[in-house]
């Protein structure tokens, strides 16, 4: 059996200029990065704004195993299948972070015969967007430290700077650092730290900005810290939003690539869903909606994280809301949520599928709360048995949710045809009536309680003393009408990653609240969630290499 990278490298790529002609994009609309990658010009983005808006399909998942459940694979395979049945379709997904690529995932461009290509480029440096975001973020850090060194005219309290440096790697040693050591010429000594690039507010801003002017406005609104009198300091006070926008002027343009089957795909932006809002860029999604009849997009991790944030944070910035939500489930994840140990997930266990179904059922119920029809996609694995599949289909029928087996990893577009037909039928027969979970005018506490009690099904929210102080500060500064972006483990509805399935009557503790004024939301940190991940005992990097001819080895 071929590996993902072997399949990808066996495909004869089409020039990107030919791929995008299918959706009305011409050569002059592109800024090429070689033959197979391009950015879309702002002229074309503005030109298509007058076009009618197509149908939007959001792909999410149940609470995953550490290896993931194939959301990107299903997203890509579904789009290929929609094109196969005659529906003009585009993809809009996130670009991978090098941290997880080198860490546990080894790649994030789909899998098997449902991949975006060239996968090696996408998984590594791609068009340089991650580096531009990293540079803009760290340029701001350098400008803050220079301001302190040059006399601190703004009266910034160096103990209350909340802006951190970033790097696009998993590096736990950088979580807490001290800068400015050595001598007075090296700046003002202070405590600092690094986040992973995809947790940077600049990443979120890039993914929510609608044009260069909106980008500058959002950058100007970033809160970097506080003065000695506790008043906030914004990027606009440093007068550097223009310089930061300049660094990002190309990164904000959506990237175009192709699938194995030649479906045009936007791959742009990559915030994590457990520590950020977990969605690709508004620009890419909005543009795809105006170029194609169907746009398939995804939101990170389970529906409790990515989908909730897509619907409460991203959707209000889009020209339409999702017409259907596809919830990806695997029998191995259902069995894990049903109490089976990780080393026994490939063994048949119908009762564990029944027990784990409570997790999937809750996600279906939650999507319906937003007024959107759900479809379940079973991402097929070779270890699945007929009895397990039949049981899952029976359970889905009991709650009235359509379900289809998808074999896109093994069979490509053909393996997603029944899923595509079911999604199209669902959209036609069950019109969506989108509603947000909460009103932004509610208090910070009320919005968090809504998410915890209605989506997670917890019974109570506890706010640590630090969080209570931060809420008072947020209210004092009139920031309390922003939506909430929960930072929580992806493995459980609760803030305890070991509490699998469908836990109830648990309490969630909010330990910290971070205002992201540029992005336009407040991050609520729970449990032990880290904004700088660490590497596993055996990183995927140990299996990677490059051949003498430059061919990548070991990505998957």
From Swiss-Prot:
Which principal EC class is assigned to this enzyme? Answer: ligase
Q: Known EC number(s)? A: 6.3.4.3
Residues reported to bind ATP: 65-72
Listed InterPro entries: Formate_THF_ligase, Formate_THF_ligase_CS, P-loop_NTPase
What's an example of a GO molecular-function annotation for this chain? ATP binding
**Catalytic activity, reaction form:** (6S)-5,6,7,8-tetrahydrofolate + formate + ATP = (6R)-10-formyltetrahydrofolate + ADP + phosphate
Q: Tell me, what's a Pfam family for it?
A: FTHFS
The pathway to which it is assigned is: One-carbon metabolism; tetrahydrofolate interconversion
Q: Which GO terms describe its biological process?
A: tetrahydrofolate interconversion
Instruction: Write down the Gene3D superfamilies for this protein, in alphabetical order.
Output: Domain 2, N(10)-formyltetrahydrofolate synthetase, Formyltetrahydrofolate synthetase, domain 3, P-loop containing nucleotide triphosphate hydrolases
What does the UniProt keyword field contain? Answer: ATP-binding, Ligase, Nucleotide-binding, One-carbon metabolism
User: Which family does the record assign?
Assistant: Belongs to the formate--tetrahydrofolate ligase family.
Q: What is this protein called?
A: Formate--tetrahydrofolate ligase 2
Organism equals: Streptococcus sanguinis (strain SK36)
Q: What is the lineage of its organism?
A: Bacteria, Bacillati, Bacillota, Bacilli, Lactobacillales
